[in-house]
């Protein structure tokens, strides 16, 4: 008899043992949570070996930032180690605890989690950097603004405000439905006004959505339900762009031209004007999405279908830049 088989997906970049480097299990604590992670150590590492703390994007993820069987952080850690760079990646707070409502936490909580890993790295290494993807990139910028990093790598990090990001994401989603521009504009204006009301402390149950076409009201209601969480309420108020001038350490910022979640043009513009007091390299990576995969449209739907986990030129850019510091 034939049994239903597990769908086998090809992920050719996922590292396979034996590795030409060492891995150690590491743990640290913050706010009552224990964080388990993997410290990847290149051959012949020493105190002068650069080390990178890796911070995941939004939503609860494991140390590999695993999504659709892609393991971007495992791929990056492998590439770094093969070029003589150490790294620490860790499972997000409450990983594997099914009773945790992850939306009760805020970006500031995740920033404190990341900061808590830095002392143990400083004990062992002289040069400690932070590499963050998406929300993790924003956290890297914020920690750098506090003087806590010797260098940072932002991969699709958000430099525009949280509110602007949410409005842009909504615009992208609604535009993809093929609706007329006036309707999209009207919807986005409504979202923008609603987010302002939420930022000013209004409960979502007190907000009216009169000016929205009937066919879009269910979508807006769903967005409103999410906006009631502490996570979104805090996210709206984030504006890393205002802190960029405080960053004194070297910055590498990469954004994909087909990113539909963190807009490439808007964010690189803010980075170019805001990073006024540090050595920085800002690159638009052509033809890649939010995960830095080569893609057709950049839509989230494609992430699973693409075999590539992360564009090789991105890995090369990161390792080369760190080694030239």
What is the role of each PLM region?
Residues 155-246:
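Accessory cap/linker subdomain of secreted extracellular hydrolases
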Residues 249, 263-273:
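Short alpha-helix in the alpha/beta-hydrolase fold that links the catalytic acid
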């Amino acid at each position: 008899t034939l049994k239903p088989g597990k769908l086998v997906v090809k992920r050719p970049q996922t590292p396979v043992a034996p590795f030409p480097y060492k891995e150690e299990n590491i743990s640290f604590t913050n706010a009552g949570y224990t964080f388990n992670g993997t410290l990847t150590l290149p051959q012949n590492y020493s105190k002068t070996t650069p080390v990178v703390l890796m911070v995941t994007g939004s939503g609860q993820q494991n140390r590999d930032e695993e999504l659709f069987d892609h393991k971007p952080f495992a791929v990056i850690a492998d590439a770094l180690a093969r070029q003589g760079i150490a790294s620490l990646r860790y499972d997000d707070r409450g990983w594997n605890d099914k009773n945790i409502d992850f939306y009760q936490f805020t970006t500031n909580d995740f920033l404190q989690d990341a900061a808590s890993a830095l002392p143990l790295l400083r004990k062992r290494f002289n040069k400690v950097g932070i590499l963050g993807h998406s929300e993790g990139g924003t956290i890297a910028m914020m920690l750098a603004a506090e003087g806590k990093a010797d260098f940072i790598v932002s991969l699709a990090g958000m430099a525009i405000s949280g509110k602007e990001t949410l409005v842009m994401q909504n615009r992208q989603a609604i535009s993809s439905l093929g609706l007329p521009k006036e309707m999209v504009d009207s919807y986005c204006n409504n979202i923008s006004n609603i987010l302002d009301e939420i930022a000013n402390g209004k409960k979502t149950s007190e907000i009216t959505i009169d000016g929205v076409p009937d066919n879009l009201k269910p979508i807006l209601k769903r967005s409103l339900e999410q906006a009631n969480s502490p996570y979104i309420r805090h996210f709206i108020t984030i504006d890393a762009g205002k802190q960029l001038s405080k960053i004194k350490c070297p910055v590498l910022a990469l954004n994909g031209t087909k990113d539909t979640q963190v807009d490439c043009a808007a964010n690189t513009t803010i980075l170019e004007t805001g990073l006024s007091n540090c050595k920085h390299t800002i690159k638009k990576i052509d033809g890649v999405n939010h995960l830095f995969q080569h893609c057709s449209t950049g839509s989230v739907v494609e992430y699973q279908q693409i075999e590539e986990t992360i564009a090789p030129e991105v890995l090369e850019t990161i390792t080369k830049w760190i080694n030239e510091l």
